[in-house]
Amino acid sequence: MNLHDHPDFDAHESVTCINDQRAGLKAIIAVHNTHLGPALGGCRYFPYGNTAQAMTDVLRLSRGMSYKNALARLPFGGGKSVIIGDPRRDKRDVQFEALGEAVHALNGQYVVAEDSGTTPEDMRIVARKTPFVSGVEDSASGGDPSPSTALGVFKGIKAALAHHCGSESLAGKTVAIQGVGKVGFALARLIRNEGGTVFASDLYAPSLDKAIAELGVIPRTHDDILSQPCDVLAPCAMGGVISATTIPTLNTRIIAGAANNQLGTASDGEALRQRGILYCPDFVVNAGGVIEIQHQRLGSDALTRSKALEIIPANLMQIFATADGEHIDTERAAVALAHRILGKPRSNPATQCAA
């Protein structure tokens, strides 16, 4: 398939495919939009079944980053990178050095950060080869943004509860979290600390065991968690879990989670609206991490960083009001708002796929 014919290609400015046999690196870097500034987005390390799956993911993720950064009012465009492999088995320092070289070759068009499957330490290795990296341990650029991602989702959940249920209180509420890795675990802790009950699942047994032992979450299987009766469903693992297949089985009033690309297709937002389920668009509610990264770069103090996260519930309330007033789904309302902030895209995007 020609890249321009890919269903998820959306006038991306550049797509770079990397196949470095010396380093054992198979990766893709996608830059969606740099209208507001250099494309900032994390590097996901995941065992995709094939390159086509990786391409679909990176195209969708990079577009989501354009929306996320725009709605967070950050001076960045949207980009993403993915590495094909198992991060628990295949990681090598030389891979991240090679990734750094590829990022550097883009001359500042893309700024890489950590994401699912990568760490601040991995980004430190990338930084050996390029300054276009954020989230680096023991440097002015900071470290792990996942606690801020979790806090942003938490604030989003409270906003959704206030809008949909009349009170933002989590006391006595039930939340089902799919995925209790770094972000999901931190979110579960915040909810438990406010008196909420947490059901949780994770395909990686040690992560679920830790959440059970330390937080008292109630375990569920990774599939059953989606149909668990609850006030809030929080997808915090991989995307695509809210789809035509799963929507009829959902037993929740609100969806608000940290996972990217939660909807299988754009039409799933309308299907949720028809069922009376309030969906918090993922690129709105999970923006805490990228907001944190920016304030790490600026050297902001803790109070400033915390206040910056208030844009998440503020955005959601605006989106909810638009969706209610125009009788449209919240995903559509959020995308429209992002497009207004992004403004007119560049007129001469240069798309490439270089091996």
Language-model features: locations:
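N-terminal ligand-binding/catalytic initiation module
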Residues: 1-141
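Glycine-rich phosphate/diphosphate-binding loop of Rossmann-like nucleotide-binding domains
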Residues: 144-232
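Rossmann-like adenosine-cofactor binding region
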Residues: 203-284
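Short glycine/serine/threonine-rich phosphate/pyrophosphate-binding segments
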Residues: 147, 182-187, 241-245, 263-265, ...
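Flexible, glycine/charged-enriched surface loops at secondary-structure junctions
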Residues: 69-74, 109-114, 165-174, 222, ...
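Adenosine-phosphate binding glycine-rich loop
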Residues: 161, 253-355
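Hydrophobic beta-strand scaffold residues
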Residues: 110, 198, 219, 278-279, ...
